[in-house]
Amino acid sequence: MKLRLLQMMCWLPMLVACSATTPSNGGETPTAPVVATAAVVDAGSLATHHWRLQRAMDREGRRIDALFVRADLPVQLDFNEGRLAVLNACNRIGGSFEIENDRLIVGAMISTKMACADPALTNLDRAISERLQGSLRIEFSADTPPRLRLLTEGGDTLEFIGE
């Protein structure tokens, strides 16, 4: 019985080798494409950076110019201890937030009420406040530099770079 088992075990590697097929691309082993995977996002990973707006597009893919009033001071988001702060607008804007799976849930935003000398800054306050409300889909990439993408309920996409 042991001899028969030993004989069968000797044939097993040969059978496995014979069953392997040669790739149809001339014998080269196919390589899987390298795909960047999104990192798990949590409040701690958001709090380690200042998030500067790099790109903003509406649902049709058009740039949202109202969010780019100051080229030298892009809109910035800071996350800290359940609070979201919007910087580089006319007024100070903030609210609560929490993360649930792939959603950033933003509470009611509050703002100071300073008069803005530049109407474009007033529009910036309104434009960013309208987009940072409710449930936003959140995507986080731990690349260098890290990237944050928010997709609003209205279909707008806001892309930030972490500094």
Task: Put a short name on every predicted segment.
Residues K2-R4, C18-E163:
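Lipid interaction determinants
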